[in-house]
Structures are given as structure tokens and as C-alpha cells.
Amino acid sequence: MKALSILGSTGSIGLSTLDVVRQHPGKFTITGLAEGHDVGLLNEQINEFRPDVVSVRDAASADQLRKLLGTHKPEIFYGIEGAATVAAAEGAEMVVSAIVGAAGLVPTVSAIKAGKHIALANKETLVVAGQLVSDLVKKHNVQLLPVDSEHSAIFQSLAGHRTEDIERIILTASGGPFRKTPAEELKLAGPEQALKHPQWTMGAKITIDSATLMNKGLEVIEAHWLFNMPAEKIGVVVHPQSIIHSMVEYIDGCVMAQMGVPDMRAPIAYALAWPERCGTGIGKLDLAKIGTLTFEEPDMERFPALRLAFDALKAGRTYPAVLNAANEIAVAAFLDKKIGFTDIADTVDKTMQAHEAYAPVELDEYLQADRWAREKAREIIG
């Protein structure tokens, strides 16, 4: 029986994780849950999974939850500190890090320092503080297992192979809802259109990131840290069917790819059960029915966010943290209809150009860059 704590339990990844857990009552148990937006749903999860500790967004949410609780009464915390407490709490062997954005960094670091294995869905943890997190993973001798479908695919395709035999890794991208949209029309695109992802069902922020291709850019940076690959050995190809989740090309010209229907329960289950596998309840892949798999080069002129991410990775230092923070602010402004679709990447670009980068060492130095970029992006948006 593997004990889990889930950070972001009421979000898309959290719900899919609990669905996998629900299918394997003799394999997994829940010791901690943390959420930020839906106290009512968290209460339902508490009644079903009976965790020892939980965390909510703020003190008011904690008071609301106390009034809702039934017979099972876990210890309640709140805020980032509360999520960090749940992440480090005794009992859990693995922590599923699925809080959206840079807010997931501090709790994930707390979990690593407490010796927990990490199932990482929060790519921003590595984007913002990849060097720090990588060093801590080694220091505390924990496993960092990818939950993103692309990185799970690479992880599986690397099994049994030497790093020196890798020519490059290739991340696949669906292309998002605007794959064929002319540049002049992108300026007029609103949140309603951008939120219509052609393949995946995800939260609002990551869906917008997929539309701008910033999500793929963040995944490039994540792949760099997960697999110790330089930017020059990380490629991106648009694959609209989202059947091949990513590939590894070896020095002999052979390419290993992981395929499957687009359902996040598959990579989640792989991370939870690793080094074993477990059932997911998802549909079987029928290649004959699909018929055709197609591939295209990404258009970095129409989607400059991907280029900005490569630039940030190559420049290093605090640039990836600034890229991520500015993007979070810009996406929120777009969802609130304060800026246009193409203004998202423009805001990130201007924030990066204004930044005087430095080499961070301590966690607070990474967070300082994050805070600066948020303020600067808000100033640019006006």
C-alpha cells in the first residue's frame, strides 16, 4: 500500500489522480490533500478518502471547511505554508505536486526536504528553480517522476538506455486550437476560443498556455532538468492527433516513441505505480480507426512564446523564472479580457527584456525573481 498526498486535489490533475486511486483501493491510500479554490469538493474528497491532514487557500476557507466536515475531521492548514505542511507531513511516501503555477514550488521543495518521492505535474517547479530542485532531489535521495504526458513518454522511452546514446528528445505538441489560424486573426482571439483545446481536457491556465505554445516551452525547460539535456538536444514537433506523446532519438538513428489515447490518467498511473504499472480504465488505442498520424514544424513566428522559452533556457540564471511569472500574470489578464491573445507573449518578451538576470542559489532568490517579474508584467499590462 503506497500512501500519497496530493497538492492540488480539486484541480484537473488532482481529480484524475483520485480517479486512479479510486480504482486501486488496495494499492494506494491518501494521507494528505491540499486545494485552493473548491472547499465543497475538498470536503467530499475528505469524506471519501479520509486524509489525516488537509490545506485550503486561506483562513476563511479553513473556517468554511470546519463547518462542512462530517465525522472525519483531519487537521486543517491554509495558505502556501499549509500546503507545505501537508507536503511534508508524516505518513506519505509520495507527494503528487499538481498545484498550478509557481505556487507549487515551495510545497514541492518542502516535500523533497522531508524525503518524499515526487510525482511532478507542476512543471513550473523546475522552470522556476530547476537547479535548486535537482540538487535537493540528489541530496535527499528521492525519486522525481514526471506526470506530464510528454515527459512520462520520454521517461518510458529512455528505460534501459544510456544517456550518452541519446541524440535528442522530441516533445510533441497538439498545436492547440489556433494551429491553422492566420496571424492577423490571432490578435482578435478571445478566451472562449482559446479554451477549446482539440485533444486534452485541462484547467484554464494550462489550456491557454497550450494555445500560445508556452506550455510546450515550459515543457522544454522541464525536460532539460528532468533528463539533463541541453537546449540543442530538445526538439518540438506538432502532432495534432496527440497519440504519440513524445519520442527519443538515439545515435544509431532509432527512435523510441510512447503512444496512447490522450488521457492524463495514463501518465499519472505510471508515476504512482512505478516501477510497476496499474490499470487506468481508459480506452484502448485503435490505430486502424485513427488511420493517420501527422507531424508539422512549430511556427515560432505566429507563436513566439515557444521561442521565448528556448531563449530563457539558453540564457539561464533567473530568466526562466521571469518567463514563467510574466506568463502567469499575462494569462490571468487575458482570461479577464484585459489584454489580447497576442499580448500574452508580448508581455513576457517585454518583461524578460527589462530583467537584469542573476545567478540564484537560495530558494528566496528564485522567489525574488518571480515577484519582480509579476510586478513588472502588471506594470506593462497597465
From Swiss-Prot:
Name the UniProt record assigns to this protein:
1-deoxy-D-xylulose 5-phosphate reductoisomerase
Record's keyword annotation contains Oxidoreductase: yes
Report the superkingdom from the record.
Answer: Bacteria
Residues noted as binding Mn(2+) in the record, renumbered to the chain: 148, 150, 219
Question: What are the record keywords, sorted?
Answer: Isoprene biosynthesis, Manganese, Metal-binding, NADP, Oxidoreductase
Annotated 1-deoxy-D-xylulose 5-phosphate binding lies at: 123, 149-150, 174, 197, 210, 215-216, 219
A Gene Ontology MF term for this entry? NADPH binding
Query: InterPro entries recorded for this chain?
Result: DXP_reductoisomerase, DXP_reductoisomerase_C, DXP_reductoisomerase_N, DXPR_C, DXPR_C_sf, NAD(P)-bd_dom_sf
* Role: Catalyzes the NADPH-dependent rearrangement and reduction of 1-deoxy-D-xylulose-5-phosphate (DXP) to 2-C-methyl-D-erythritol 4-phosphate (MEP).
Q: Any one Gene Ontology biological process term?
A: isopentenyl diphosphate biosynthetic process, methylerythritol 4-phosphate pathway involved in terpenoid biosynthetic process
Q: Which SUPFAM superfamilies match?
A: 1-deoxy-D-xylulose-5-phosphate reductoisomerase, C-terminal domain, Glyceraldehyde-3-phosphate dehydrogenase-like, C-terminal domain, NAD(P)-binding Rossmann-fold domains
Q: Which family does it belong to?
A: Belongs to the DXR family.
Question: Which gene holds the coding sequence for this protein?
Answer: dxr
Pathway it works in? Isoprenoid biosynthesis; isopentenyl diphosphate biosynthesis via DXP pathway; isopentenyl diphosphate from 1-deoxy-D-xylulose 5-phosphate: step 1/6
- The entry's NADPH-binding residues are 10-13, 36, 122, 124, 203
Name the catalysed reactions.
2-C-methyl-D-erythritol 4-phosphate + NADP(+) = 1-deoxy-D-xylulose 5-phosphate + NADPH + H(+)
Q: Which cofactor does it need?
A: Mg(2+); Mn(2+)
State the organism of origin. Answer: Chlorobium limicola (strain DSM 245 / NBRC 103803 / 6330)
Please state the Enzyme Commission number of this protein. Answer: 1.1.1.267
